[in-house]
Swiss-Prot record:
SUPFAM superfamilies: Nucleotide-diphospho-sugar transferases (SSF53448). InterPro entries: MobA-like_NTP_Trfase (IPR025877), Molybde_CF_guanTrfase (IPR013482), Nucleotide-diphossugar_trans (IPR029044). It comes from Polynucleobacter asymbioticus (strain DSM 18221 / CIP 109841 / QLW-P1DMWA-1) (Polynucleobacter necessarius subsp. asymbioticus). Keywords: Cytoplasm, GTP-binding, Magnesium, Metal-binding, Molybdenum cofactor biosynthesis, Nucleotide-binding, Transferase. This is Molybdenum cofactor guanylyltransferase. Its EC number is 2.7.7.77. It catalyses: Mo-molybdopterin + GTP + H(+) = Mo-molybdopterin guanine dinucleotide + diphosphate. It is an enzyme of class 2 (transferase). The gene is mobA.
Amino acid sequence: MISPENITGLILAGGRAQRMGGIDKGLISFHQKPLIESAINRLKNQVGPILINANRNITKYAGYGYPVVMDETPDFSGPLAGFSVGLKACKTSYLLTSPCDSPLLPLDLAARLAAEMERGPFDLVYASSLESGKTWAQPVFCLMRANLQDSLTAFLTKGDLKIDRWFKELKSSTVIFDDAQAFANVNTPEELKILEAAL
């Protein structure tokens, strides 16, 4: 059994947030608290150590008491850049990734992905959601083995940043969650208002 202590949680807060006007999404207020706080609170009982991947406002993020890791690639290169620095900093056997702007992320995310990982062997297991009879991949909600650093470095060296293409190079599986809203994220001011009103 994979224990929570053997999983490092990586909260991805390093994006450019163009659709939010370039505002740092992790620091946007959601019910009077920054989104990063919701991510920490929903993740902290599921994992051991926590890392925050951020590329600006480093001091503010560091104020939450967790190590902050910055992308090593320029120009906000996407979630794989965050995965890469997270894997390098990870001291446990597994890394669980989650974006900072999904304040309803499942409280059993780690447990369910870990159960599927043990059913493997798999390199990584990601979440999917069921909505209107369709299954939608949620690849940034992902549990991966910490030994994937070399694979990811080689992939990024080719100049590819597409998360689904890296997954195809690996032994992967998915876990389907019935509550699609659990993965709802905030990309625009309108989505923020809708999500706040739903709670």
